Amino acid sequence: MDALQTQTVNSTTAPQPNYIPGLIAVVGCDGTGKSTLTTDLVKSLQQHWQTERRYLGLLSGEDGDKIKRLPLVGVWLERRLAAKSSKTQSMKTKSPALWAAVIMYCFSLRRMANLRKVQRLAQSGVLVVSDRFPQAEISGFYYDGPGIGVERATGKISMFLAQRERRLYQQMAQYRPELIIRLGIDIETAISRKPDHDYAELQDKIGVMSKIGYNGTKILEIDSRAPYSEVLEQAQKAVSLVAIVSDRRSLT
């Protein structure tokens, strides 16, 4: 695996933070079914507890669909942005242009704001299921880490933004979920589910995502290659236990 693709962000020496009661995050490579699982979990859990789904990535599939629906240029623009985004996000490429670094930093600020909203929602007693979760261990938006990358940034302004962004992710890493569900997959299954994705990028992401520790958060590993009914059942049992232990708002 390319060394630049998996640069580790310096960790802090602060004491391990407490988790956020009632917050569950589902993570994994593309093709593992994160969006489907989080949606179905919320539908099931809403029968018993006040439950809401939140997206803590950068841009959701819904955002991409909105761009596609723009008159005349929608489909072309979405493909163009996706291609540019893929090239800029890769840690194997050179430092992003200054304008791109500014946009990436703004995305990270937005992610921090969304995470704080999720924290407040969970603190109100709502059971929150998050699709994806930020981490500060490995650089790269691919892995939900810092996107600019202090390892590749050049120029005073870009380096300044990269360092600020790294601190942002170190702060976000202090917001630990009560439970992380990590969906595992192999490259052949992933590419069969996402044939439009780059094989090498998927393979890299599978390897990297399996190593992230999420600052000591409790992680439940589930094999997403299993029948979906089994995957959903395992996740439901784990999240239901979290809801009970964290005393979420009951509807019964």
Swiss-Prot record:
Gene3D superfamilies membership: P-loop containing nucleotide triphosphate hydrolases (3.40.50.300)
GO terms for MF: ATP binding; dTMP kinase activity
Domain of life: Bacteria
Annotated GO biological process: dTDP biosynthetic process; dTTP biosynthetic process; dUDP biosynthetic process
A single Gene Ontology CC term: cytosol
Similarity comment: family membership: To E.coli YghS and YghT.
Protein name: Uncharacterized ATP-binding protein YghR
